């Protein structure tokens, strides 16, 4: 092995090799730990340049505490300790309809959930005592899962059938009277009958979102607000009642729950034995629908309880089966001020239903401004041939004089919107000649 001094003589004599320094890394082999000693870099020669640097570093002390920032909402007390945020000493809550809840709980309470939202029955109705009459409180209600299982109805009882679905976003129902004073809450029971349960994850109405076939437990929270504009609360108390546990369903599974709901719910009278929605009535309605509509006998048009006009949806049968009435004479038509039965004739309705939109079908006879001699070779006027709906016996289809028989007014005006009934001596047309 050659020494560097022998390989590079032009660089001059080098520094002699020395033993490893005490601070050298001992992990290297001894042959590689030998280094060169550089006397030009001794510390004694650099003291004039490094006089301000201390040999041993000192640990920095803790910074002084920062001054308190001014509050944006005025003077505010310091937040209470964490243990005080979850306690309201002396406050108690009792379930008003506890006996009803126990009756349902003995069978297994079920609550219907729908996409639109369904109210709970029984509803949570509580009474509170021990509140400060002058302080303000908020009443909240939420529903949380009891366990991590999914249930199914197995003949006579509920049993777990697998793992629960992922928990949905938690929602809280705020009582509409919140915030209110303690005297207001203690004056009467607090009812949460407006709470609605839904299974729609995209519900925009704020209803409580639940999974079907899961067991839930309602919780009631009482929150005291020391200052309405403050971000700190004076205390929170949560209450839960074991008898209010229920299973959410989209249709009742237990027949006994169905009977209990019908018997106890005042809004389910129609589903009782004597109600319109009882099983006997529902089966009868289904049979009637399968048989089809039954014909209803219609009474005479002059009766007092029957509406006058075939457009009434309460009438049955075909209007063409009725006997047509004879055409009135010109004297009777001129003296008549209103059509019989309060509406136009059935023949006019067959031509166009707009005749029954409230327009009169009998108009006074038109008197021409000046007499005209009849022309035997001239065809009958268009108006007489078109307006004649019911020619009398022995008369031809064409007449030389205008007819005064009943007609539908929409034929004259050319649209289904009737003109107002003309006054005495009035006319429907603005000209002085007959229409051709």
Swiss-Prot record:
Entry-linked Gene3D superfamilies: Transcription factor, T-box
Coiled coil found in the keyword field: no
GO MF assignments: DNA-binding transcription factor activity, RNA polymerase II-specific; RNA polymerase II cis-regulatory region sequence-specific DNA binding; RNA polymerase II-specific DNA-binding transcription factor binding; sequence-specific double-stranded DNA binding
PROSITE patterns: TBOX_1, TBOX_2, TBOX_3
GO cellular component: chromatin; nucleus
Record's compositionally biased regions (Low complexity): 332-344
SMART domains given in the database record: TBOX (SM00425)
CDD domains: T-box_TBX6
Gene Ontology annotations of biological process type: cell fate specification; mesoderm formation; mesodermal cell fate specification; negative regulation of neuron maturation; negative regulation of neuron projection development; negative regulation of transcription by RNA polymerase II; positive regulation of transcription by RNA polymerase II; regulation of transcription by RNA polymerase II
DNA-binding region: 100-273
Segments of skewed composition (Basic and acidic residues): 275-284
Region spans: Disordered: 67-87, 275-344, 360-383
Record's keyword terms, sorted: Developmental protein, DNA-binding, Nucleus, Transcription, Transcription regulation
Location of the protein in the cell: Nucleus
Function: T-box transcription factor that plays an essential role in the determination of the fate of axial stem cells: neural vs mesodermal. Acts in part by down-regulating, a specific enhancer (N1) of SOX2, to inhibit neural development. Seems to also play an essential role in left/right axis determination and acts through effects on Notch signaling around the node as well as through an effect on the morphology and motility of the nodal cilia.
This protein's name: T-box transcription factor TBX6
The organism of origin for this protein: Rattus norvegicus
